[in-house]
Swiss-Prot record:
This is Lipid-A-disaccharide synthase. One of its GO terms (biological process) is lipid A biosynthetic process. Keywords: Glycosyltransferase, Lipid A biosynthesis, Lipid biosynthesis, Lipid metabolism, Transferase. GO terms for cellular component: membrane. Gene3D superfamilies: Glycogen Phosphorylase B. It comes from Solibacter usitatus (strain Ellin6076). Condensation of UDP-2,3-diacylglucosamine and 2,3-diacylglucosamine-1-phosphate to form lipid A disaccharide, a precursor of lipid A, a phosphorylated glycolipid that anchors the lipopolysaccharide to the outer membrane of the cell.
Length: 381
């Protein structure tokens, strides 16, 4: 029975890796999977060695504070790899953790497939040297990444975005509004503060202020879909008298039926783009992390939507710009409709076209992994 180590450090990676595992089970039904898991990987039958919730930390300074715990999980995962001797490892996202894991696995002669490329094109470009040495195949989910990494000698393949063709609502707008007792005549705003508790806690105060300001100007429905990694109670404890309705999951339904999303920069903005939902993006880290990042990051935009488009399609309110006043101003402008909203929707449609033009990413990833296991490493077309 072949064993495969699978590791995902955050919610999006947990989803992407679980889709690949499901495809692998179809072509390798006798394979056994173990590793660092979130709820989706566990649901896909991957045996847990480390819980990915213990790795969900963002920001340079924030990571430093959690190094002892993260190092303990790192050692636990590598100990399992030594004992179980997997034929291959699939590492997903979370590069600060997984590139170190890749280095150790390379020494154990375990082939490493890396799913979701580290953003070396944006910062810390020196990481490509380590990747070239330790990674057997890099599976890229954005169209511009393959060329960048191949230029540096990393064996990269663009497989398409795992969410392309997958993101869609389960309920109609009428069903969603009825289920959550929303006023049918009011616009719907989704609040998406991030899938990690640390980042969500930093964003909540400004978002609460923004919603209060919006509510004073326009009657709206507001929902906050809580991810499995944060939980409903985490947000309910922080809502006070806010009109925000916290719901469990259902983020795709919420975004699909929203007139606007207030979205933390990350995977959720790609999901909103695939659903065609206008949005205002934001993000905030600690002051020290922000200053350090300003010296290290070399990209024109922070939002992946704008990076894919190659232009400013959605507003970006980063760090000190992320205030309730600024969020509310941008939100009200877009809720009013008109030219700005239509131009954004046209830009989002172009982003969707770029991503949705290559569906079936999990299947292509599974075939690439199968080829490596069979010793037939070829370019996946």
């Amino acid at each position: 029975m072949p064993k495969i180590l699978v590791s995902a450090g955050e919610a999006s990676g947990d989803l992407y890796a679980s889709l690949v595992v499901q495809e692998l089970r179809r072509i390798m039904p006798d394979a056994e999977f173990f590793g660092c898991t979130g709820p989706r990987l566990r649901a896909a039958g991957v045996r847990t060695i480390v819980d990915s919730a213990d790795l969900a930390v963002v920001g340079l300074i924030e990571v430093v504070a959690h190094i002892p715990r993260i190092y303990g999980e790192f050692r636990k995962l590598l100990r399992a790899a030594r004992e179980e001797r997997p034929l291959l490892a699939i590492l997903t996202d979370s590069p600060d953790f997984h590139l170190r894991v890749a280095r150790k696995l390379h020494r154990q002669e375990v082939p490493v497939v890396y799913l979701v490329a580290p953003q070396a094109w944006a910062w810390r470009r020196g990481r490509v040297r380590e990747m070239r040495r330790t990674i057997r195949r890099l599976l890229c989910i954005f169209p511009f990444e393959e060329e960048f990494f191949r230029r540096y000698g990393v064996p990269a393949t663009y497989i398409g975005h795992p969410l392309a063709g997958l993101v869609h609502p389960a309920l109609s707008r009428e069903e969603f509004f009825k289920k959550h007792r929303l006023a049918a005549e009011r616009p719907l705003v989704s609040v998406l503060p991030g899938s990690r508790r640390g980042e969500a806690a930093r964003h909540i105060p400004a978002l609460l202020d923004a919603v209060d300001r919006i509510y004073r100007e326009q009657a709206v429905n507001v929902v906050l879909p809580a991810s499995a990694t944060t939980g409903v109670a985490f947000f309910q404890e922080r809502m006070g008298n806010s009109p925000i309705r916290v719901i469990e999951g259902e983020s795709w339904d919420a975004m699909a039926h929203s007139d606007l999303a207030l979205a933390a920069s990350g995977t959720v903005t790609v999901e909103a783009a695939l659903l065609g939902t206008p949005m205002v993006t934001f993000y905030k880290v600690t002051g020290v992390s922000w200053l350090a990042g300003k010296f290290l990051v070399d990209i024109p935009f922070y939002s992946m939507v704008n990076l894919i488009a190659g232009r400013a399609v959605v507003p970006e309110l980063m760090q000190s710009q992320m205030t309730g006043e600024n969020l509310a101003r941008e939100a009200l402008r877009l809720l009013q409709g008109g030219r700005d909203r239509e131009e954004m929707k046209a830009g989002l449609a172009q982003v969707k076209e770029k991503l949705a033009g290559r569906t079936g990413a999990p299947g292509r990833a599974a075939l690439a992994i199968q080829e490596i296991l069979e010793g037939q490493v070829t370019h996946v077309s």
